[in-house]
Amino acid sequence: MSMTPREIVHELNRHIIGQDDAKRAVAIALRNRWRRMQLHEELRVEVTPKNILMIGPTGVGKTEIARRLAKLANAPFIKVEATKFTEVGYVGRDVESIIRDLADAAIKLLREQEIIKVRHRAEDAAEDRILDALLPPARVGFNEDPAQSNDSNTRQLFRKRLREGQLDDKEIEIEINEAVGVDISAPPGMEEMTNQLQSLFANMGKGKTKSRKLKVKDALKLVREEEAGRLVNDEELKAKALEAVEQHGIVFIDEIDKVAKRGNSGGVDVSREGVQRDLLPLIEGCTVNTKLGMVKTDHILFIASGAFHLSKPSDLVPELQGRLPIRVELKALSPQDFERILSEPHASLTEQYRELLKTEGLKIEFKPEGIKRLAEIAWQVNEKTENIGARRLHTLLERLLEEVSFSAGDLAISPDAAPIEIDAEYVNSHLGDLAENEDLSRYIL
């Protein structure tokens, strides 16, 4: 990650409106990963990541920041919900499976990168195998000179036709590696055992091939994947993945507030306090056994988030609070924020609906006053009922464009015709009554 914090925030601004404090904290944390890697090894070991706790109501951008961060980081990243895990010893997934999933994500990420590097070599090798199937080598008698030049010219001619797609529908018989896959279902918490069994069965059938009759375009795709797999060194890949997980891994734990013990409840809850105590060594730094080997979690960055509607950050066990030193509070959205969300981000909601309906030949245009009125209604409904943040806009837009979406095929008009205008009057006529009537908005919006 060589992007500066300012560049990271600028990139996040393309997709997320407001929440500057959260963006800055995440950008600094990401940049610190890069800074740490520039240090001498002795000091590098001592510098641990400063984990983040994001606090804010639902629908204000906590999860979206995580999603966008994953794409920016180009590092092993996994997003999990804290509610999916139970205390060790009980039925369900234990928190160590987070690191195992992170290891899987690292292998997938690095394999894709390696395959891109060897893509051209794999394509050449795949073409040769397809040409061998199309043009079997001529049999040559003893002491006879093979007509190499003729063969070569014919092969080049076929290679040209293959690349131009002229042979795509021709059927050939070709040897393909036999896929050995065994689906094993197991109870939650036993994923490691199923992975080991699947690896065992896969290794038993490794190297077996079978002859298949396929169209050239399908065979080319399969053979290309096969050749790319051969060119990637699995042992080297595992070593790189292990380093990537330990040095650059990022874990985003959502819904952390749901495992916080509420102030007025007594006793110990298996799904709450036990999960927090299991998370402690993971965040502090421990060693977890994965398919890559033993993974140390000391330098993995953990970002936790929660709405904390029914509990407070202080309801988390004190040790966990201490392991999440950076606190960032995300603010509730205002009508102006809703207005910006509808129009400013890259691939905004209004742009998505406009492009979707354009596929039917129907043009719609969102007027500024229509967007403003829609934002006001979203804010009003959130205030009167449950505040679900920007997710309310999805509900309102679906309701607003329901009739247009349903009749789009019938309404499609000539390309020169004027578009359907979504202005304040249109919004009021479709949503005004529902927004004003609290009982209706509670059930419909």
UniProtKB/Swiss-Prot annotation:
InterPro entries: AAA+_ATPase, ATP-dep_Clp_protease_ClpX, ATPase_AAA_core, Clp_ATPase_C, HslU, P-loop_NTPase. GO terms for molecular function: ATP binding; ATP hydrolysis activity; peptidase activity; proteasome-activating activity. It comes from Pseudomonas savastanoi pv. phaseolicola (strain 1448A / Race 6). One of its GO terms (cellular component) is HslUV protease complex. Belongs to the ClpX chaperone family. HslU subfamily. Keywords: ATP-binding, Chaperone, Cytoplasm, Nucleotide-binding, Stress response. A double ring-shaped homohexamer of HslV is capped on each side by a ring-shaped HslU homohexamer. The assembly of the HslU/HslV complex is dependent on binding of ATP. It comes from the Bacteria. The lineage of its organism: Bacteria, Pseudomonadati, Pseudomonadota, Gammaproteobacteria, Pseudomonadales. This is ATP-dependent protease ATPase subunit HslU. Pfam families: AAA, AAA_2. Gene3D superfamilies: 1.10.8.60, DNA helicase RuvA subunit, C-terminal domain (1.10.8.10), P-loop containing nucleotide triphosphate hydrolases (3.40.50.300). One of its GO terms (biological process) is proteolysis involved in protein catabolic process. SMART domains: AAA, ClpB_D2-small. ATPase subunit of a proteasome-like degradation complex; this subunit has chaperone activity. The binding of ATP and its subsequent hydrolysis by HslU are essential for unfolding of protein substrates subsequently hydrolyzed by HslV. HslU recognizes the N-terminal part of its protein substrates and unfolds these before they are guided to HslV for hydrolysis. ATP binds at I17, G59, V60, G61, K62, T63, E64, D254, E319, R391. It is found in: Cytoplasm. Its main location: cytoplasm.
